[in-house]
Design a protein with these regions (language model features):
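Catalytic domains that recognize anionic headgroups
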Residues: 1-169
């Protein structure tokens, strides 16, 4: 029997703050997931932007390989999600509505795309997104085996420059 896979990415999370002997943040739930699953102790970002970095994670290629910059990602590009789908996995996800994720979710069996146009409206885990995710997993709404991808934006908004200030020098 194939295992179910829960794949979580957290926008703007620094690994050095949340794991290892020198960590400076308290993360009991992440620690619990790590103890029960797989954690990669050495990670190096392929790019300094979310879209480019995630494209590298999902394709195992550097962004320069196929000209990805920011959220410019073709749904025709082979990803690990396509491979899991071909292997019989039900693909589901909770992602923001950036262009990158729109392309990525075109091949999903189901997805909840939450609004990102107005940064204040990004769903946070504590504002209902977490409950939706738990409900999806515990009520067997996904066919087995499943691959559930979650991209969390909870720690991102404090670092986001408001639109009205983006063009200022």
């Amino acid at each position: 029997m194939k295992p179910n896979i829960l794949f979580i990415t957290i926008d703007a999370l620094r690994a050095d703050k949340t794991y290892g002997k020198n960590k400076t943040s308290t993360t009991p739930h992440i620690d619990s997931l790590i103890s029960k699953g797989v954690y990669f102790e050495q990670t190096i970002a392929a790019a300094d932007q979310t879209g480019s970095s995630l494209a590298s994670i999902f394709t195992s290629n550097f962004p320069i390989t196929f000209g990805i910059n920011q959220f410019n990602f073709s749904s025709k590009t082979e990803t690990m999600l396509n491979i899991f789908k071909k292997s019989g996995y039900y693909i589901d996800g909770f992602v923001p509505d950036h262009d990158f994720f729109k392309s990525l979710t075109e091949n999903f069996d189901n997805s909840d795309v939450y609004q990102a146009e107005k940064k204040a409206s990004w769903k946070r885990l504590g504002d209902g997104l977490g409950a939706q995710i738990i409900d999806r997993i515990t009520t067997n709404k996904m066919k087995k085996p499943w691959f559930l991808y979650i991209h969390v934006m909870d720690i991102r908004p404090p670092f986001e420059v408001p639109n009205e200030f983006r063009d200022e020098k």
